[in-house]
C-alpha cells in the first residue's frame, strides 16, 4: 500500500530528481484536504452499519437476487454479501485516507472478479450495490468528501467491470 506522499516521493526518486512544482502541488493538495478526509473517515466508521444497510435496501433487497433461487437467497449468501460490502467500504475509506488507490488493487481487486465468476456471484448486482453505497456515503459525508470518496468506489467498480 502506498499513500499520496510515498507515490510522489517514489516517482521523483526513481528519476533521481528533487520534487518538481507538479509534485509539490500534489502534496499540497493532499495536505490541504487532510482534515476533510479524516472527518469523512470518522463519519464513515461511525455509520458503517447504516451505510451498508441503506445500500442493500437501495440496490438489492427487493430485487430477484434475494428471492428463492436468487444469488443472495440463503442467509449464508446474504451474510457473505453484507461482509463483502463492508470490506469494500472499509478499504475504499483506507484508500481515501491514503490518497492512493493501490490498497484496493492489492487487497480487494486482485483476483476478485475471477473468484466472483467462479462462484457465480453476479458482478452487475455487486457493482449496483457499490454505486448505492457511494450514493449513501456521499449523503453522509457531504459533497466535497463525497467526491473524494467516490473516486475509490468508482475504482472498485471499474476493477470489477
Curated annotation (Swiss-Prot):
Pfam families: Phycobilisome. GO terms for biological process: photosynthesis. It is found in: Plastid, Chloroplast thylakoid membrane. The modification N4-methylasparagine is found at residue 71. Its main location: plastid. The keyword Cell division does not apply. Disulfide bonds: none annotated. Contains one covalently linked phycocyanobilin chromophore. Keywords: Antenna complex, Bile pigment, Chloroplast, Chromophore, Electron transport, Membrane, Methylation, Photosynthesis, Phycobilisome, Plastid, Thylakoid, Transport. InterPro entries: Allophycocyanin_b, Globin-like_sf, Phycobilisome_asu/bsu, Phycobilisome_asu/bsu_sf. (2R,3E)-phycocyanobilin binds at residues 66, 71, 76, 81-84. One of its GO terms (cellular component) is chloroplast thylakoid membrane. It is a peripheral membrane protein. Light-harvesting photosynthetic tetrapyrrole chromophore-protein from the phycobiliprotein complex. Heterododecamer of 6 alpha and 6 beta chains. The basic functional unit of phycobiliproteins is a ring-shaped hexamer formed from two back-to-back trimers contacting via the alpha chain subunits. The trimers are composed of alpha/beta subunit heterodimers arranged around a three-fold axis of symmetry. The phycoerythrins also contain a gamma subunit which is located in the center of the hexamer. Belongs to the phycobiliprotein family. The light-harvesting antenna system in red algae and cyanobacteria is formed of phycobilisomes. These are composed of the phycobiliproteins phycoerythrin (CPE), phycocyanin (CPC) and allophycocyanin (APC). Cyanobacteria also contain phycoerythrocyanin (PCC). The phycobiliproteins all share the same subunit composition and organization with variations in the covalently bound open-chain tetrapyrrole chromophores. This is Allophycocyanin beta chain. It comes from Pyropia yezoensis (Susabi-nori). The gene is apcB.
Amino acid at each position: 500500500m502506498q499513500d499520496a506522499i510515498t507515490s510522489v516521493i517514489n516517482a521523483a526518486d526513481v528519476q533521481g530528481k528533487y520534487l518538481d512544482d507538479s509534485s509539490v502541488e500534489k502534496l499540497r493538495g493532499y495536505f490541504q484536504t487532510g482534515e476533510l478526509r479524516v472527518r469523512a473517515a470518522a463519519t464513515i466508521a461511525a455509520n458503517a452499519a447504516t451505510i451498508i444497510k441503506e445500500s442493500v435496501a437501495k440496490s438489492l433487497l427487493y430485487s430477484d437476487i434475494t428471492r428463492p433461487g436468487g444469488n443472495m437467497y440463503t442467509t449464508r449468501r446474504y451474510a457473505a454479501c453484507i461482509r463483502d460490502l463492508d470490506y469494500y467500504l472499509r478499504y475504499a475509506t483506507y484508500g481515501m485516507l491514503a490518497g492512493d488507490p493501490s490498497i484496493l488493487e492489492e487487497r480487494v481487486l486482485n483476483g476478485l472478479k475471477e473468484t466472483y465468476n467462479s462462484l457465480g456471484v453476479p458482478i452487475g448486482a455487486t457493482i449496483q450495490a457499490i454505486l448505492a453505497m457511494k450514493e449513501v456515503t456521499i449523503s453522509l459525508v457531504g459533497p466535497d468528501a463525497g467526491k473524494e470518496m467516490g473516486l475509490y468506489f468508482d475504482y472498485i467498480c471499474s476493477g470489477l467491470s
